[in-house]
C-alpha cells in the first residue's frame, strides 16, 4: 500500500521506493521534466532549484494537451511536489482544463501558481455530463471502479 511509505509524500524522495527504482521511474521523470524545462527556457524561464530564473520576461501563453498522468508529472515539477500525492488524491475528468500562471513577484525569480484545476464548466455549459473516468468508488460496496 503506497500510503504506508512516507517517501511517497516527499518531493525529493518519492522515487526511492523499491518499486519505483525497479521501474527506473526517476530516470523517465527527469527525462520528461528536463524536456519540459527546455520548452520553458525557450520562453525565457530557466529552472534553478525550485524556481525559475527569468531571462526574458513575457506574457506568452503555452498550451499543453496531455493525459492525466503526464499532466501531474509536469505540474509536480513546476510546484515541487511529489507526483504520487497528486496522482492518487486529485482527479481531473477527461477534457478538463487546468490553468497555471508564472509569477515574477521578485525581479528575475519566477514561480508557478495553479489558478484552476480540472475545470469542466465547458461541459456543463453544453449540458454534457462529466465522465466517471479516473475516479474510483465512493464506498467499497458500490458497483463502481475499485483499486
Question: Can you name each region flagged by the protein language model?
Answer:
Residues 1-43:
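Phosphate-handling substructures
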Residues 30-65, 70:
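A mid-sequence, solvent-exposed acidic-amphipathic segment
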Residues 46, 50-61, 73-147:
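Acidic, low-complexity terminal tails and accessory targeting/binding regions
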Residues 8-9, 69-72:
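Short hydrophobic/aromatic-rich motifs at helix boundaries and adjacent loops
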Residues 1, 62-66, 114:
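Extended, compositionally biased low-complexity polar/Lys-Gly-rich tracts
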